[in-house]
Curated annotation (Swiss-Prot):
Heme b 1 binds at H101, W206, H209, Y280, R287. It is a multi-pass membrane protein. Pfam families: FAD_binding_8 (PF08022), Ferric_reduct (PF01794), NAD_binding_6 (PF08030). NADPH binds at I411, R446, T481, R513. Disulfide bonds: none annotated. The gene is CYBB. Heme b 2 binds at H115, H222, R226, I227, M268. It comes from Homo sapiens (Human). Its cofactor is FAD. This is NADPH oxidase 2. Changing G223L: In CGDX; requires 2 nucleotide substitutions and. InterPro entries: Cyt_b245_heavy_chain, FAD-bd_8, FAD-bd_FR_type, Fe3_Rdtase_TM_dom, Fe_red_NAD-bd_6, FNR_nucleotide-bd, RBOH/FRE, Riboflavin_synthase-like_b-brl.
């Protein structure tokens, strides 16, 4: 239990608090509409669907308040960089912002479904009561408001039978119109956010996500007509429901039972969402201001395996290891921003990203930079680039540990390029205050060509550590996870050579996948009583494996070895 608490305790606590608040709001508002006399006659008309519609509405307000906060990148980056505000454990929660964003989105979808279904029943009962297709009590309540000095309870004012009556309400009432619009927006946003769409059709994901603007506008005005009505306090004072509920035919005729008066509650949703919407507006203004700052591409390097490197400069740009930026190329798309990890080190006088060509946008950037041509491309012909960032990630905390495990899969190695470069520069400058004493680096890749662009950096580090008699500082293991029979024969022939046939490094390439249980146990035995940072940039399946290994190989109690798992999310 102690092992689990070290890695996941705070995360689970945050989730439980969030779930608890959802349960509290649901139960509280269910009782508000299901018990008090204010809504007695409304319950007579609508039944239990009244409370079942209003309770999830309160939860929707709460979650719609939260949904924008995890995507305020500049706010999170500010909090992350404030040591007075955020400890390492709190920063790890900020690094899971997108996970929380998705959880809140699914909660919004759940409560939207309950809210919508309950209101469909409400509409049916209101329309039926209006056309005398219901019990006499509901019909009598529905006739309130037809005469002068009366306020209505039933929001269906026209005598139109179902299903036409329900459709009429959907297209004439503000609540109906906005309800249809925001539900359609929500469906499009969620369905376009699947992993398949994001990876293969990012443009679809990007554009449909901006329907959130329409969603929030519709949400803010959804309740403006106040069609869910309850008895007013003044009416309750003179109209005692205990006495009058069975004397509906005598309402307005006897002194003790005047005709009840009804009114809707003032809209509340805007009060929940105005703060986050203001913060997000500030976020977008900061992004726009940054996008207008001049960025100069100083070099474009074409690497094997359809990977390009962009080296850039921007006035006032400051970065830390492992951070990422958003990039827009107006020549390719005037609206799309794409995230890329910085592969340069803070000590360098430029910042760089490595981009693998896998989609329409990256293909367009590849062509815009002239990488599809054989001849040299003049600098003035390179496209204009807009950059937003940098933004913090889990990898920023790598220098907070004495021992770290860095695990990259495929192009997921890019955050660690920045870290390893920075380590190299620190050793070149004889850094004496470096807390980090040992790096275990693992790189898993399917194709041999993918190793080529990264091998030079590893060779520099390898030689640097040997020159300074600190060869044990960096232990790296490169795994080739895909090969054919001819490659295997070639590797076997050259196995006894001094340097690896693929990378040119002294450390030989390994084939297959690591035995993570053995790796963790070996590292734990070599570093007792140590907090070891485990940093991954790779697929979810590998993240699940490493997270479980971090928990199972950590010792309970404050002392002993503890593996702290961190994963890149952007």
């Amino acid at each position: 239990m102690g092992n689990w608490a070290v890695n996941e305790g705070l995360s689970i606590f945050v989730i439980l608090v969030w779930l608890g608040l959802n349960v509290f709001l649901f139960v509280w508002y269910y009782r508000v509409y299901d018990i008090p006399p204010k809504f007695f006659y409304t319950r007579k008309l609508l039944g239990s669907a009244l409370a079942l519609a209003r309770a999830p509405a309160a939860c929707l307000n709460f979650n719609c308040m939260l949904i924008l906060l995890p995507v305020c990148r500049n706010l999170l980056s500010f909090l992350r960089g404030s040591s007075a505000c955020c400890s390492t454990r709190v920063r790890r929660q900020l690094d899971r912002n997108l996970t929380f964003h998705k959880m809140v989105a699914w909660m919004i979808a759940l409560h939207s479904a309950i809210h919508t279904i309950a209101h469909l029943f409400n509409v049916e009962w209101c329309v039926n009561a209006r056309v005398n297709n219901s019990d006499p009590y509901s019909v009598a309540l529905s006739e309130l408001g037809d005469r002068q000095n009366e306020s209505y309870l039933n929001f269906a004012r026209k005598r139109i039978k179902n299903p036409e009556g329900g459709l009429y309400l959907a297209v004439t009432l503000l609540a109906g119109i906005t309800g249809v619009v925001i539900t359609l927006c929500l469906i499009l946003i969620i369905t376009s956010s699947t992993k398949t769409i994001r990876r293969s059709y990012f443009e679809v994901f990007w554009y449909t996500h901006h329907l959130f603007v329409i969603f929030f506008i519709g949400l803010a005005i959804h309740g403006a007509e106040r069609i869910v009505r309850g008895q007013t306090a003044e009416s309750l004072a003179v109209h005692n429901i205990t006495v009058c509920e069975q004397k509906i035919s005598e309402w307005g005729k006897i002194k003790e039972c005047p005709i009840p008066q009804f009114a809707g509650n003032p809209p509340m949703t805007w009060k929940w969402i105005v703060g986050p919407m203001f913060l997000y507006l500030c976020e977008r203004l900061v992004r726009f201001w940054r996008s207008q700052q001049k960025v100069v591409i100083t070099k474009v390097v074409t690497h094997p395996f359809k990977t390009i490197e962009l080296q850039m400069k921007k006035k006032g740009f400051k970065m830390e290891v492992g951070q990422y930026i958003f990039v827009k190329c107006p020549k390719v798309s005037k609206l799309e921003w794409h995230p890329f990890t910085l592969t340069s080190a803070p000590e360098e006088d430029f910042f760089s990203i490595h981009i693998r060509i896998v989609g329409d946008w990256t293909e367009g950037l590849f062509n815009a930079c002239g990488c599809d041509k054989q001849e040299f491309q003049d600098a003035w012909k390179l496209p204009k680039i807009a950059v937003d960032g940098p933004f913090g990630t889990a990898s920023e905390d790598v220098f907070s540990y004495e021992v770290v495990m860095l695990v990259g899969a495929g192009i997921g190695v890019t955050p660690f390029a920045s870290i390893l470069k920075s380590v190299w520069y620190k050793y070149c400058n004889n850094a004496t205050n470096l807390k980090l004493k040992k790096i275990y680096f693992y790189w898993l890749c399917r194709d041999t060509h993918a190793f080529e662009w990264f091998a030079d950096l590893l060779q520099l580090l390898e030689s640097q550590m040997q020159e300074r008699n600190n060869a044990g500082f960096l232990s790296y293991n490169i795994y080739l996870t895909g090969w054919d029979e001819s490659q295997a024969n070639h590797f076997a022939v050259h196995h006894d050579e001094e340097k690896d046939v693929i990378t040119g490094l002294k450390q030989k390439t390994l084939y297959g996948r690591p035995n993570w249980d053995n790796e963790f146990k070996t590292i734990a035995s070599q570093h007792p009583n140590t907090r070891i940072g485990v940093f991954l940039c790779g697929p979810e399946a590998l993240a699940e494996t490493l997270s479980k290994q971090s928990i199972s190989n950590s010792e309970s109690g404050p002392r002993g070895v503890h593996f702290i798992f961190n994963k890149e999310n952007f």
